[in-house]
């Protein structure tokens, strides 16, 4: 599509994400201090997340962060258990973390209402502060992302990641995490300027690819795969660097595109090893956050490893916008999709 890359809503909204996070951290500081104190008193034995689409990818990030930092078991609720099967699990003594941009999907609302009746403390991360979800939750954490017009979420997804980090930092009273998070907006601005055009050139005519990561980066990998589908009409599958060995790597052939994200934590060595192995099979491997022989290295910003997935997705959004245009598509208007999706 013959449009400048900065003319799309996706570009403008993703570019605005650093300022969104900056404002969000300030606006929610006292609110999350109170919530953190409540959670320390409650001592929940588990967290249950509930979300759809990009918000569910943020929930994947929440699982890894909560379990690694707080050692609290975190699992994902399937809304259909309540909204379709009309079953209500016992959620006494748990935190039910609902994440949504619109806060309006009927299945999400039905599940949240059931969770409250089942004894959970409901915390909602939601962009629409006057939404039904915000009204039914025990605690609401505004995403503060403002109006998002592009069908493909960007700044609201990043705002979900930063809200999760601020929530966990406040719950644990983790000053180091909160200090790292305070530096995120400036680092995100740097990440936006990085040149990922090598990925655009390699994926312009692709029909399939894997997006691979692990641990704290898995939710960002899931988000990237969705964005390839939504904005580029490109079939992409998100898979962990461990899970890909349990069957999926059988389809990786010479020239098969593989985009790998890595953060500099305990998972990096394994991710790099996989990248090296796939490149050795002559797959077209692109790596962000690590290096491997015979692969293309996409530049990243080094930071606290917990921030690196968010910084990578900030760079990714600019690339995927350019890729959509290069493939002749309008990233703001994917076919058959609407901004607010309501499922039952």
Give each language-model segment a name.
Residues 40-186, 214, 261-306, 310, ...:
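Glycine-rich phosphate-binding loops that contact phosphosugars or nucleotide phosphates
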Residues 12-15, 131, 313:
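Alpha-helix N-cap/helix-start motif at coil-to-helix transitions, marked by capping-box chemistry
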Residues 3, 302-344:
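Generic C-terminus detector
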Residues 5-44, 139-143, 147-257, 267, ...:
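Active-site phosphate/pyrophosphate-binding segments
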Residues 224, 271-274, 312, 335:
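Composition- and surface-driven signal marking solvent-exposed, interaction-prone regions
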